[in-house]
């Protein structure tokens, strides 16, 4: 089953929890490893960009450019959905309909377009459905 993964899950898996918890990184790492093994990981260009920017400035120590680049190549071997103007328009409509933030709406619309049935995130309400897409928080 294909699953879209939000940026924060990748950050926990590969950078860790800047607050020092080990539970979230272990859970995120296990989830990402399973999805990659099953060839079921989906991300968007937005997720790759956010991951890259945050991975190189968060964590102790932050990831290097080379480490970040290797991880992006790993993710790119999976399914990567490009954010384009039509997706931005759909996200704007979603903001108006659902009253969620623009960035969350863009993630939701990318996940829907990708055909994913699950969106793993901790930033939105778990259990919420948008058509066939269900939001899940892997840490609950």
Predicted regions and their residues:
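Short, well-structured N-terminal submotif of metal-dependent ribonuclease cores
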Residues: 1-43, 57-66
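Histidine- and aromatic-rich ligand-binding microenvironments
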Residues: 5-6, 44, 100-101, 123, ...
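Anionic group-transfer/hydrolysis microenvironments
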Residues: 8-10, 14, 46, 52, ...
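Generic alpha-helical structural signal
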Residues: 25-29, 69, 73, 89
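Active-site-proximal, substrate-binding regions of enzyme catalytic domains
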Residues: 46, 52-79
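Active-site neighborhoods of divalent-metal-dependent phosphate/nucleic-acid chemistry enzymes
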Residues: 77-119
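Acidic, PIN/NYN-like endoribonuclease modules and their adjacent C-terminal/linker elements
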Residues: 108-140
């Amino acid at each position: 089953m294909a699953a879209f993964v939000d940026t924060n899950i990748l950050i926990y898996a590969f950078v860790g929890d800047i607050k020092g918890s080990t539970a979230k990184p272990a859970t995120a790492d296990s989830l990402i490893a399973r999805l990659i093994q099953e060839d079921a990981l989906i991300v968007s260009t937005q997720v790759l960009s956010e991951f890259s920017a945050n991975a190189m400035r968060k964590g102790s120590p932050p990831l290097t450019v080379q480490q970040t680049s290797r991880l992006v190549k790993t993710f790119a071997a999976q399914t990567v959905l490009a954010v384009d103007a039509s997706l931005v328009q759909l996200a704007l409509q979603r903001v108006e309909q659902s009253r969620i933030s623009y960035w969350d709406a863009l993630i939701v619309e990318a996940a829907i377009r990708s055909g994913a049935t699950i969106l793993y995130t901790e930033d939105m309400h778990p259990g919420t459905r948008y058509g066939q897409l269900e939001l899940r928080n892997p840490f609950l």
